[in-house]
A protein has these predicted regions:
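Internal helix-turn-beta structural module
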Residues: 104-110, 125-188
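A domain-level signal for the structural core that forms small-molecule/cofactor-binding pockets
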Residues: 39-40, 71-72, 79, 177, ...
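A glycine-rich helix N-cap at a beta->alpha junction
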Residues: 12-35
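Glycine-rich phosphate/nucleotide-binding loop
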Residues: 42-141, 148-149
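Short, conserved loop-to-beta-strand elements that form functional interface hotspots
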Residues: 29-39, 163-165, 188
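Amphipathic alpha-helical segments that form well-ordered structural scaffolds
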Residues: 14-18, 118, 179
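Glycine-rich beta-alpha junction loops
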Residues: 4, 37, 56-58
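Single conserved hydrophobic/aromatic residue that forms the stacking wall/gate
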Residues: 1-6, 10
Length: 189
């Protein structure tokens, strides 16, 4: 089928000519497998590999894995065009269910980490492209603030349900963002 034909072309025209020797030197192996086998390997695995997928397969499987091993709200995505354009985004989409609750005036505990990291990725890239190191430094500090806030036990509901930290403080969306801001302010001082 299409997948095995595409893999054969890749192996002959790209891998064998450009990467086979480099992989061998580094003790890395390349192999093609069908998506069902790849999924089974991932579920049993502890990592240590790169999994290249076609767009749809990669989209669905990365969402599945992020959810299975933590929270979809912790995963970002970067789209890179052949023309050198970059788009940073939260991989989870719009979280409509929470948005509709918000419209009704109901409190939500939506995890904004993926959206924050989409912004930090874009800021870091912009700083790189325009040679403005301060943008990258700010992005690094904001990401550090997110991590420290969670490590200090302040988190949204999705993380509070899976954390191993004792007595996590479950925050609504706005309070979590305020906590990240307070941590960022202390890091920037």
């Amino acid at each position: 089928g299409y997948s095995s034909a595409a893999s054969d072309v890749y192996k002959r025209q790209i891998y064998d000519k450009e990467y086979a020797d480099k992989f061998k030197e580094l003790g890395i192996e390349y192999f093609y497998t069908l998506i069902d086998d790849a999924v089974a390997r991932v579920i049993r695995s502890e990592g240590g590999y790169i999994w290249a997928c076609k767009n749809y397969d990669g989209d669905v499987m990365s969402d599945l894995l992020a959810t299975a091993f933590g929270s979809l709200s912790m995963m970002t995505s970067v789209l890179v065009s052949p023309h050198g354009y970059f788009e940073y985004e939260a991989a989870h989409g719009t979280v409509q269910r929470h948005y509709y609750k918000h419209l009704k005036g109901e409190e939500t505990s939506t995890n904004p980490i993926a959206t924050i990291y989409a912004w930090t990725g874009a800021l870091r890239k912009r700083g790189e492209l325009d040679n403005i190191p301060a943008l990258g430094e700010f992005a690094d500090k904001l990401e550090e603030a997110c991590i420290k806030t969670i490590e200090n036990g302040e988190m949204t509901k999705d993380l509070a349900l899976i954390t191993t930290l004792p007595n996590p403080k479950t925050l609504n969306t706005q309070d979590f963002i305020k906590a990240v801001r307070a941590t960022l302010d202390s890091l920037m001082a």
